[in-house]
């Protein structure tokens, strides 16, 4: 193939340098430059569409007018360093605590002077650096996450400073001694407390609540601030949904390793200044919002979560005084006489049942509303139509919250109303309402016989088909199994998760509901049981069925022999290994079955030791003890401790374990005391003293 002719040597270099010099001289040429419009006109043709630059010019003008500060960017080396540091901290692969401390100190030293570019500074120092910039940071896509994390980390510091004030001068002196003058120069003596820093953030954001309430990123930060000021848990199940958008940045993938995140699971003590600031903040957030605007905000995808937090704080933290206050957010959203007159307010509440966003607000109201309001709400709006609401995909979640609050009589009445809808719910795999009914029936001691009959008629009388329908397990051929091993595993469907949870709830309920699942397990062949055990979702129901209790002893006696010859395969599977561990507790009162299963593990020792999962099962079954000290393993298998020789020494927390000589002395003393009981009290005490001294005399004689 012919090649392109190219010049080589000094002539080519000379021509390239000349061309480069000419290119550099172009911008300084006095010749008038052709504008973009002229260029477009010159190139215009029949099929030419001119480029509209008006939008670009407007964006540039808006960008020039925007006063959002630019804090700079990290260079490539700094980005690579902090990215690797973040990965190292997430993996937490340090040899010891000193190694981790030295690594963190080196990261702090590298981050000095770059606090507004990254968020890896000590909490209060970083708080000081961010002060004055929070209004812009909370509206930034990534900086808003930094602010939320900073506030969550600083919340426990407020409580700790209230409990025990710290001597900041002494603290700074210790820092200088540990890290030198360079380590203590960034911590001034007049460093503000965490409470003052939070109050400074609120004062900095004041006057801007109106548009921050519905701002896509700042609204998340407002929710965090509200919960911190109220002292509410920041990691609870009820507040986790409204804190932040977890799907946006995949926040759940980061595993929390700090102890400060573990201290915010429950309610915290907050200073009085926080209560006053919280009332003022809620008042400013809702200032100028009438009932019409609040009802529109209830279905707003960004503003509704903030409204949920405000209502939960008003109804849960501020007492009953807010219910009587006509200016409160709750009373402006739902007036006092709304539920009685059945006017526009009732229509508004009915519309929330079927709205994806408004139903979440209704769940919050049902969860935190006072008992008087809830009874009226249930009587006038929900009770007569709870069956149709349970059938709806969105309204069913509100029904679940309602079922968690009703009394035993109302629960039984609700069950009778929902029973006609059971076949439809089973057919469409909407099992969360049924699971909630079973859970609440266990707590309220309600009758579930009618529910069991409805479920049996919906799933059929065939036990194996019923088990497969509930757990979502299908029989696979060998070719299909080989194909599944090659293909990547897909995520578990919600229908299978709900089915597994329903089976677990049925097993926890005594009577007919548990018998339905147990009989289904007994009718299933061994291949199906192994398939269920190796399924990460369905195996949970199998583990629940294996939990020992007095009511399922007969079931376990019939069911456990089905695992003979399967222990090795179960131990080498990621889900089946959990079932193998559950078999240890399941055979606590069936020692002959436990010995048979343990012998299977011992026969397959090489395969188990070559696998990480197999080694875990080997350790949990104490197989080393089984091979070397069979008697001690038998005591452990029966649930007995070696130190528990007699009832008098059963309490191991009373003192250290007694030696054989001490135990012999105790038995000798007890025997002597029984022999001296027919005599008088004085003789009994004298005989006891002689008995206690007898073993020591015998020891000296030896």
From Swiss-Prot:
GO molecular function per UniProt: RNA binding
GO term, biological process aspect, one: ribosomal small subunit export from nucleus
Gene Ontology CC terms, in alphabetical order: 90S preribosome; nucleolus; preribosome, small subunit precursor
Per-repeat ranges for Pumilio: 288-325, 344-379, 380-416, 520-561, 562-599
Chain spans, region Disordered: 1-68, 162-189, 639-702
The entry's keywords: Nucleus, Repeat, Ribosome biogenesis, rRNA processing
Bias kind Polar residues: ranges: 643-652
Cellular localisation: Nucleus, Nucleolus
Family annotation (InterPro entries): ARM-like, ARM-type_fold, NOP9, Pumilio_RNA-bd_rpt
Keyword Secreted: no
Feature: compositional bias, Basic residues: 1-11
Presence of the UniProt keyword Repeat in the record: yes
Compositionally skewed regions (Basic and acidic residues) per UniProt: 12-22, 52-61, 673-685
Signal sequence extent: none
UniProt family annotation: Belongs to the NOP9 family.
Known function: RNA-binding nucleolar protein required for pre-rRNA processing. Involved in production of 18S rRNA and assembly of small ribosomal subunit.
Name of this chain's protein: Nucleolar protein 9
Gene giving rise to this polypeptide: NOP9
């Amino acid at each position: 193939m012919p090649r392109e002719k190219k010049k080589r040597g000094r002539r080519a270099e000379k021509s390239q340098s000349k061309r480069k010099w000419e290119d550099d001289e172009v911008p300084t040429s006095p010749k008038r430059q052709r504008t973009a419009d002229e260029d477009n006109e010159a190139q215009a043709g029949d099929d030419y569409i001119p480029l509209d630059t008006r939008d670009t010019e407007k964006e540039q003008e808006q960008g020039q007018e925007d006063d959002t500060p630019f804090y700079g960017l990290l260079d490539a080396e700094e980005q690579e360093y902090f990215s690797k540091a973040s990965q190292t901290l997430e993996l937490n692969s340090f040899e010891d605590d000193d190694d981790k401390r030295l690594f963190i100190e080196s990261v702090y030293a590298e981050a000095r002077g770059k606090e507004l570019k990254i968020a890896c500074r000590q909490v209060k120092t970083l708080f000081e650096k961010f002060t004055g910039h929070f209004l812009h940071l909370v509206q930034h896509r990534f900086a808003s996450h930094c602010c939320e994390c900073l506030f969550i980390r600083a919340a426990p510091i407020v409580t700790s400073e209230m409990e025990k004030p710290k001597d900041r001068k002494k603290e700074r002196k210790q820092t200088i001694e540990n890290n030198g003058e360079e380590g203590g120069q960034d911590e001034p003596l007049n460093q503000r407390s965490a409470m003052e820093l939070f109050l400074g953030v609120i004062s900095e954001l004041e006057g801007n609540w109106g548009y921050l309430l519905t701002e896509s990123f700042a609204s998340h930060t407002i929710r965090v601030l509200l919960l911190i000021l109220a002292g509410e848990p920041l990691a609870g199940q009820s507040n986790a949904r409204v804190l932040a958008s977890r799907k946006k940045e995949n926040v759940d993938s980061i595993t929390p390793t700090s102890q400060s995140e573990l201290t915010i699971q429950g309610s915290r003590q907050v200073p009085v200044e926080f209560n006053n600031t919280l009332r003022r903040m809620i008042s400013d957030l809702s200032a100028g919002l009438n009932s019409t605007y609040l009802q529109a905000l209830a279905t707003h995808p960004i503003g509704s979560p903030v409204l949920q937090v405000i209502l939960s704080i008003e109804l849960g933290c501020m007492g009953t005084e807010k219910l009587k206050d006509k200016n409160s957010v709750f009373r402006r959203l739902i007036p006092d006489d709304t539920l009685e007159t059945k006017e526009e307010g009732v229509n508004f509440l009915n519309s929330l049942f079927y709205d994806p966003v408004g139903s979440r607000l209704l769940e919050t109201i049902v969860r935190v509303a006072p008992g008087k309001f809830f009874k009226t709400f249930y009587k006038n709006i929900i009770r007569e139509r709870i069956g149709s609401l349970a059938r709806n995909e969105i309204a069913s979640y509100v029904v679940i919250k309602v079922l968690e609050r009703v009394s035993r009589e109302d629960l039984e009445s609700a069950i009778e109303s929902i029973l006609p809808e059971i076949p439809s719910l089973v057919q469409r795999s909407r099992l969360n309402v049924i699971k909630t009914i079973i859970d609440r029936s266990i707590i309220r001691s309600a009758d579930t016989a009618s529910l069991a009959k409805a479920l049996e008629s919906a799933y059929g009388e065939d036990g194996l088909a019923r088990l497969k329908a509930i757990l979502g397990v299908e029989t696979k051929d060998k070719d299909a199994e080989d194909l599944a091993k090659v293909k990547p595993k897909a995520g578990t469907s919600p229908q299978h998760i709900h089915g597994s949870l329903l089976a677990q709830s049925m097993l926890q309920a005594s009577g007919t509901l548990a018998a339905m699942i147990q009989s289904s397990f007994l009718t299933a062949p061994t291949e199906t049981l192994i398939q269920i055990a190796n399924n990460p979702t369905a195996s949970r129901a199998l583990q629940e069925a294996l939990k020992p209790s007095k009511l399922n002893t007969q079931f376990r006696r019939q069911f456990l022999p089905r695992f003979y010859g399967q222990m090795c395969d179960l131990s080498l599977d990621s889900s089946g290994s959990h079932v193998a561990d559950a078999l240890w507790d399941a055979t606590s009162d069936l020692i002959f079955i436990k010995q048979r299963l343990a012998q299977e593990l011992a026969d397959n020792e090489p395969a188990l030791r070559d696998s990480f999962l197999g080694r875990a099962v080997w350790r949990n079954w104490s197989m080393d003890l089984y091979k070397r000290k069979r008697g001690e393993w038998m005591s452990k298998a029966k649930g007995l401790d070696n130190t528990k020789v007699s009832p008098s020494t059963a309490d191991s927390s009373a003192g250290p374990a007694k030696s054989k000589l001490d135990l012999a002395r105790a038995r000798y003393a007890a025997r002597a005391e029984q022999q001296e009981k027919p005599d008088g009290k004085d003789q009994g005490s004298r005989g006891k003293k002689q008995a206690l001294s007898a073993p020591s005399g015998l020891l000296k004689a030896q």
